[in-house]
Amino acid sequence: MQLITDYQNEFVAFMQEHLKERDPKNLYDPIHYILNVGGKRLRPTLTMLSADIFGTDYHKALYAALAVEIFHNFSLVHDDIMDAAPLRRGHPTVHTKWNLNTGILSGDTMLILAYQYFEQYEPNIFQELAKIFSKTAIEVCEGQQYDVDFEQQAQVSTDQYLKMIAYKTAVLVGAALQMGAIIAQTSEENKQKIYDFGLALGIAYQLQDDYLDTFGDASFGKKIGGDILQNKKTLLYLKALEKGTPEQKQELLTLYSTEPKSEEEKITRVTELFIATESHTFLRAQVETYTLKAFAILDTLDIPEEKKNILKEFGGSLMNRTI
């Protein structure tokens, strides 16, 4: 088995090899740009790792891994347009660096390019990959729409929020793993279980992201409090509203509906309310619940223990990160 960094390095080299300069430059340059401004390469790594774990040369999974990464970045380009976000990974967003129309067109092209990379596989594997990819792409769009809808909703339940992050984030983690299993042509049971593992892990991953946005370690360079400043209805916020006193609830609603005199003061006070209502404790418990659920599914996979342990270590490293 390869080290995770080995998969990542091989993937980046493969991606660079296949990102050819093409015309019109104002369509393709933004694609190259967004794919080269960093990112953890989590999803393509999982596709390669899954193929390896199920007994196939992981190099066979590189085209699917590239499709997954391009699709993920397509979703970010369009998310940034909808959020009017000026920065992504510390760099100007595509629509900011170019323009809105170019951002839309480049994103659309990325979605189509992702499908084209599946054409490298034989027909039966291509059909399976395209099926899970289409299902996942629709779910990601549904998740994004839920997120947009929640901005206008006065009330959002915990279950609604969990469904939104499952669709917007976790289904692609599950699909990335399942694609590796499809390429390895493992059993149908293994394909479903590795997807379910990824779905649970993806939910835990996003919940951990929500937690770190407020309670992460600023010394690592991560900007703390971005979700608070954007008035995002994360699980921290929703649970604080649910568990807080009438006074705490009203203060939180006011903080999220008025322009702050000081951004730092807003972050500090909202964080204090999260702690006072113990919503941060609830969120940490949810991260642990979904991580343990993922590992319980992993235990039922029909693969050797040492391969299960690789996935457990990788999952554990995601949940224990500080940035």
Predicted features by range, described:
Residues 1-323:
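All-alpha prenyltransferase/terpene-synthase fold signal
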